[in-house]
Amino acid sequence: MRQFNISVIGLSGTEKDRGQVGVGKSCLCNRFMRPMADDYFIDHISVLSQSDFSGRIVNNDHFLYWGDVRKTTEEGVEYQFNIIEQTEFMDDSTFQAFKVGKMDPYSKRCTATKVFSAEKLMYICKNQLGIEKEYEQKVMPDGRLSIDGFVVVFDVSPVPNRSVEKQVEFVQNVIATILKNKKPLVLVTTKNDDAYELYVREAEKISQRKDYKSTVQLIETSAHESINIDLAFLLLAQMIDKVKNRVKIISYQESAKSRKELLDTRSEAVTRLIRNQITDYHVLWSQGSKMLSQYREWNEFLNIFGHEAGQKLFRRHMKKLRDDHLNKKLHQYLDKFALALEYLLPDIGALNISDDDAWECARNYLQNHIEFEQYFFECPQASWTELVDMDEAEDEARIPFDVLETSEAETVFRNYLNSVQQDKKKIGWKQQFKMLLEESGFVTPGKQLSEVRVLFMGRECFEALSEHDCQQIYDIHQDDIIEKSKQNFVELLLEHAQYFLQFKNVDNITQEDVRQITDVIQEDSRYKMLDRLDQERRLMLVQHLRFIHCPIRDHCPFFYNCVDSLIEEVLSDKSASNHKTPSGGGWKSSGSGSDRTLNLLIVGSEHLASDLLNDIRICTGSKGEYIYENQTYYLNYRIANGDMEAFKAIDVYSSGLICVYSNQQSFETLKDNLERTLLCNLELEDKFENLPIVLVYQPQDLKENEVEYLRNEGMRLSEMLHCDFIDHTQNHQKYVYDILNIVILSLKLTEMKSYEPYPSNHTDLRILCCIFCGDQYDIENIVQPLVEESTLVKANEHSIIVDVFIGDAKRRVEFILSSYHGTSQYRDELIHGYIYFYSTKRRSSLANLSILAAQNANIPLQIIAVTESGGVNAFFNSDICQFLITEGNAVADRFKGSFMTFSADQYVKFAFYNPFLKTAWDNKYEVENLHVEESITLDSGEGTLENSVNQMPRPPPRHESYMLSNTLGTDGSGSENYEMAPTRSLNSLNEERDISLDEIYDDNEKPKHLHQKWLEDKSDGRRNMNKNLIWNNFSGSTHAYTTGRRHIDSNLNKIRPKGPSQTLKVGEAPSRNCPAMSSSTFTLPTQQPGKLNMKNFQLVSDAVAKMNFTGSGSGSGSGSGSGSTGLGLGLGSGSGCMGDSFLEPVDKDGKRYDHAQLDGEDEDSEELAEYEQIYENEDCTESDSCASSTERRVRQQNAYYKASKKPVAAKKQKKKKVAIPVQTPRVPPFGSYVSPPEIPLHYQRMAVGGSGPEKPEPCVPEFMKSDKSPEYSMVPELAGAGIFGAENLPEYNMNQAKCLKDFEKLEKRRIKEETARQRKLQEKEKEQEKKLKRKLKQNAKGLVESAEAQFGKLMITSEQGEIPIFLNKCVEFIEKEGLDSEGIYRVPGSRAHVDMLFQRFEEDTNTEIDALDIPVNAVATALKDFFSKRLPPLFSKDIIKELEEIAGSRGVGNSKLNVEVKTDRSCRLIALKSLLQKLPPINFAILKYIFQHFVHVSDNSKLNSMDSKNLAICWWPTLIPIDFTDMGHFEQLRPYLEDIVQTMIDQFPYLFCGKDAFVMV
């Protein structure tokens, strides 16, 4: 390593010689020797004291030794430098140069090539003088140095008292001397950061002098900026070393730019480092620097800028942190202040101020407000900025009042003031625009805004509002006028009640009927008003026809305001305060009279409960008062913020449980606690029974898919818990009111259900009070005189019993309150008098009254006209009122009844009804005798068919169909998730083609009141409890309740003829003898009003357009098969049990075929024997409902069922009828083909004549007695016109021999083809089995290891043979632990548990599930996953296609099966058994094992609510995997595949074990 001794020289001397400051020699040396910022000193002096001059550092010399340093070039060459600075020191006393020996001038002395100074120390800074020992001490080597080169300094900055000429002269003399001594040198200009351009050019001239011969290189430097310092010394070293490739000389501008970029980079890196690492403005410099010292960026910054710059940057960052914190806190206060303004100062007009002093007055107003301390606090000792640093202020949620002194707070107030004023203007404009729309006659229903926009141009209210606001107001107005127009149209239809009466008992409404109705009403303005909404108008007409045909509450156009519903509410409220009415459950609102207390428990994590409580308090005020339907409720709260232990100690007197969640974590916690609390202890006494629960979702700032997922999960949980679900985002403005309304309504419904019906067996009079739906008067005024009686006792939801004096004796009178349309259910009951109320403002009210009065003309009648307030004035002031009162009086005279008027605001007492009660009592015996005479004709004996098929039976009791709660039943009906599913089975696939009116709606779609969007498919929380009604399709015949449904017996005193049951008791041996029938001829049943599945149509117009307006009748209903025009909306009663009617063959001309009885039976075919064994049965006994197979099996095994049934009290007993095993016709959905109900001729059991006790004979047609072939069971039936009628099948004549011969040929050919096909399949299966055996022999490890290698350890067979061990253990565990678990297979288990279970079995097949502590629902889910994901499909694609054909889901044209098999249930059952026998043995064994498990589960359906229907719904997608192309295909196949699985469960002994089949119709 080369070592160089460099001497730095420049102009020196007194101020007269060098000017006020030096040329920068010391700074240049300092930066070169110690470049770090903390080691660089800018204050170097040449005026010293005598002591400093004589010290070891100066050592009485006029030069300084700066020490030695090592530098490396870019090429990696390393040099060592010893630096000498030649200067001239002045005496501080004389300001003259110190005299040291012989003194040469500085210009000559500085160019000396050798310097001597013994024991001279290294110079660092001026502070070192006098205290040398406190600094590093380094002695000049050997006390002498030979100078190798010179750095000549030229100052280019302007300095006072120094001329450039003097400096140029000095530099030129020095350079000349150095060149004479033949020493290398470089000319260095210093202070270029403050350079003067003239001086720079002078320096350049010096270096470019020709006599220097380019030996003088010019380097531009700046010691303060550390630019080109090393470059000057390295270049001099290379010149001394005579290196050819020297460093490149870079100009000052380029070096300065590079230096600036470096500094900026280091500064940004350190700034970013400090911002990331230092986030608390309380951190001290000592702590922060220690924390940052471990980072390279920080150390590099300190080297360049120094610690002082680092500390300055740190403190600047701390100040920014504090300012940010203050701004953040201020914004929080301002946000709270904005909310406080909305609450404390809702009306700016209350201030009565001008804009100038508004802010000052507002502050004074807030400071004097009564709730000031709730939102603000004052702290005179310190300002709010100082409070921020205090820990005590962190928990303070109120606003420091001195925040209002800031300009930002005033800005918030000004913005609030402007927004309030703008909102007032906007509200005014909206109101003006709404009034403009109401006053404009050209805005009609259905007209778009674009059509009338030009008419509003120039109006201020229209121009001021935005496009969105105008459209929103216009839409609201359209909704209002459309709703009003629909009400008027309904009113128009009701006014023509007399005309619509002719359609009441019509089975099929034709297109001509619709045209005639339209001709009658089309001239009315109320009809024309809906010209633009023709589809809705047409649908409303259809709905009205449906209501006329089946007048039940669900079809009432005033659904929510139906009188039947209002009466229930009124009687419930009135009876609640009566001491004779039993109290309800434990979850009640406390208090009595007009005030009640609601005790609410609010549960949620992460302060959600507290936030919800604050919202409730804001809505209910400080006193916690809430008014609902004129009833005041006082709210008490109890919250549990994440404390789910509150469930264990919950107060049984609470009124409702409100559960709130916002994210995945809070939902999982809430769901876990709810399930453990409400679902896991069902076998114990449930203290949460009837507890209203509301699930509230308040989403956080989540992604849209996460919000949608949590919303769906919440809705699924609410369905499982049978509670209500509220999404805060969808109705954030009034969701609190929705919560409180749901809790109160639930309590009311619970109280209504808790009232014990009062027996009404011994009443002296029964009076039916009829009120028309939609009348605009308060029903309470009518009911009040009755309920205020001290002897009042509530009999049921619609009747009360009052003890009253009639004449001289006290009589017990039952008042039945009903709507006009609800009177049909009391048609056959004994009623002693009718009281009809009608409104004097509605023509429709009187029109319907006239019809009802005509139907009961022989019974005492009281007509009461309800007028507006004003009494007599109402009669004279209103023409319509005068007309209707006069007409009502005339109706009363015509039917010999009494007439009275009743003012809506009139208070009357019970004596108001006394005159009519006296009249009813006087005519009691005549009415009862008349009732007995009429009742005798209803039924004449067993098995007769005298009742007309067009006679509509009465609906079931109101308390059954109207007040059934939407909860789990005890008869295995399953949860509400499955109650509304289609309940088809194999025996119900034969359906009539005509579509009845009830098909217009799904089971879960109900017509709503016109005010509540009657025509829209929307749900309403108020009626959630009544949405699943058992009797929602009741019309013309007794219902057949399919699998999974239940029927509750009536306990009212009613005379209702019961239709025969079509079910056989489980376990009875089917008989081959047929019961004798009273008649040899039968008629087709009428069809029940069905419902249109609106999900099959995207628009209402599609629904109306596809109503199947056909030109030919279907043969159903009247049984005539004539070609009359049919609308496709069958109004008959064919759905449900057949009742007293039976199918009969009808030929083309409408003639009936009579068949003689046959005897004998055929044993030639095993298939025929199975067919007959399934189809034939013993005499059927009458039952209350056509229940499911599971229900019948449970009833037969449970003796308590019969013992616990309450006898139905009836005024007139009827004989039991003999059940006829007829398939239950069902209404198919649009677009699917279903064949009509047919029964083979030889199974139609006909009596020879009479109804006497004759010996029953086998039911085989006479012309088939001698036939011994097995094919005679396949003779087709001709059932009138239709697909299988004379138009589509060969005409069936009475030439039996020819017909039978042709049929036998076809059947023999089919049997041969079937036999050959089966033989080929068997041969193919045998060949496959042989191949499989050969493969197994080749494998030394056997079948078990092969299965394990292919499918994993889960497929290892168990001890039971071919059953996988995983399947075996799961089934054993579920049957051991989960048969009593409610919703098994329906309630999913945890995915973590499922994955753990599979993992454990993969590791060890001998794993015991009991030891894993896994819930039974998780095991059930794992079992389903095993079938769907781990186990190969049990059914091949060909087998699945045959399953579809057997189920009847394919049309006849696409099916390989014949018509008989497609249309007959027993044939399909035999075909299903044959199909299962085609399965491979392993598949059949697994299928048999799992279905045997399903039988065990369904046998415990009373405990787990999973009967065969619900199991089929849960399992069919798993067992029968089909790739659906679209939803239409899925909806078409779903009911049939469900029935396949349900039948395999119900018929398990027959299909899998070879036993006799259960007969279910």
UniProtKB/Swiss-Prot annotation:
Transmembrane segments: none
Activity-regulation annotation: Negatively regulated by integrin, bsk and Src/Src64B.
Annotated pG1 pseudoGTPase domain residues: 592-765
Statement: the UniProt record of this protein carries the keyword Phosphoprotein: yes
Site residues (Arginine finger), renumbered to this chain: 1386
A Pfam family reported for this protein in Swiss-Prot or TrEMBL: RhoGAP_pG1_pG2
InterPro entries, alphabetized: FF_domain, FF_domain_sf, P-loop_NTPase, pG1, Rho-GAP_domain, Rho_GTPase_activation_prot, RhoGAP-FF1, RhoGAP_dom
Protein name: Rho GTPase-activating protein 190
Source taxonomy: Eukaryota, Metazoa, Ecdysozoa, Arthropoda, Hexapoda
The encoding gene: RhoGAPp190
